Amino acid sequence: MAAYAFLLGSLWAADPDGAALYQARCAACHDNNSAEERAPKREQIAARKPEAIVGAMFDGAMIAQASGLTLDEGRAIARFITGKEFSAASDVSMGKCDAPAKKLSFAPGDWNGWSVESDNSRYQAKPGLSAADVPRLKVKWAFGFPGDSRAFAQPSVVGGRVFVGSAGGKVFSLDAATGCTYWSFKADGAVRTAITIARPKTGSRYIAYFGDLRGTAYAVDASSGALIWKVNLDKHPYARITGSPIFYEGRLLVPMASFEEASGIAPGYKCCTFRGSLASLDAETGRQLWKSYTVLDPPKAFKKNKNGGQMYGPAGAGVWSAPTIDAKRKLVYVATGDSYTDVELNTSDAILAFRIDNGSLVWVSQVTAHDNFIVACPNRSPNCPEVLGPDYDFGTSPILRTLAGGKQIIVAAQKSGVVWGLDPDQKGRVLWSTKIGAGSVQGGVEWGHSADRENTYAAVSDVSAGVDAQPGISALKLATGEKIWSTPAP
């Protein structure tokens, strides 16, 4: 271990530019780690591939900190941290399918996009296997993402094919039976969304829709991977699409989030100007039909920080997850994240309802007010809100379900560790709330939850919740929120 540390130190020392850049851009968090900042220690990052670190700087969580860096400077930082050289470019032609794919068609048991249904219940009524089958499952094939060190996009399985995005910005179409590659497509940024497969018109070709971490939406031919259209939906430098696009009646609904809250560590940054949004596009052409912001008023200068820097607001309320379709009421629901500034904002940490036809806002149900938060505030960056909020975003999509008797309910799960039941007929009035986790900046319900016809199921992270952490999974009754069972994480 000592020899390894000496060698690693020697390699770091051999790259003084990388060391200097690291000190200027990275050390404040990674050499002074705290759970609040969600920053891994430098020795943890050193175990990663340099390619992964460059990806984080230019397409991922560190995009704010890397602002203004050249690619060569980013690579120097990655070499300094890891003590490793970059690998030769991976050959994406390896593993190509020998025969062309058959004509694409949907089949029972397919999983298309973020959820099988546009209500975002994430419930497969015809899975093709039972719980008793799970212990007998064996690995048939495995696919390694070329040049990547992590996989973070949910696959879609449609017509015997697997469609999946990657941290390296490539989208792949694989044979579900063998894992061979039919095609790959290179996006401009990392692709974290699920891939949605749809026909914009009856009888037309199937199209694969997705978004990247640079705020661009794409449509490619699902059979060949050929680009049909792409459109950037937000020019803000930290805009990103993490929520999966939803196809509905010829429209593509695309949510927008950002990583601007990570810019707070930079004292000179003019914080903050991003507004979450939802865009409706013509699914055939990519033409924007409407775009509605979750922050209704444009940001304005409202005060100077302690360093004399101009601050702006309101800002925030990004939409991290897929929108939810309410076909009966002709509405689309989104769940929002926190506010970035001290300017009052009643649409953060909320469920919002927009009209599908024109994007007009119908109602707002905010469950956590005054959640003003940006990253690195334990170090008291001059951009920090006066009173730091708990960072209780909604990272999951709202779920719309029909109860026995016909009444409908919206279920939403939050990073606070609370699951909410809302009434869609009463402007999102809270029907019940049940706390299943401690909640924290990395706690509560982070991404996915689901619901069948009677219950809702939510997994709790609570990574940074300390002694109060309650990681695990819980089942609640849809009608009342009553906890039926809870199983702790292993």
Q: What is the predicted function of each stretch?
A:
Residues 95-140, 294-299:
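Blade/loop signatures of beta-propeller domains
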Residues 132-146, 171-191, 196-204, 209-239, ...:
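Extracytoplasmic/lumenal domain signature
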Residues 65-91:
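C-terminal capping alpha-helices of c-type cytochrome domains
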Residues 124-132, 136-157, 162-163:
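Asp/Glu-centered strand-loop micro-motifs enriched in Gly/Pro and often flanked by an aromatic residue
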Residues 19-23, 27-65:
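Gly/Gly-Pro-rich "capping" loops immediately C-terminal to redox-active cysteine motifs
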Residues 36-38, 118-124, 147-153, 172, ...:
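Short, solvent-exposed loop/turn elements at domain surfaces
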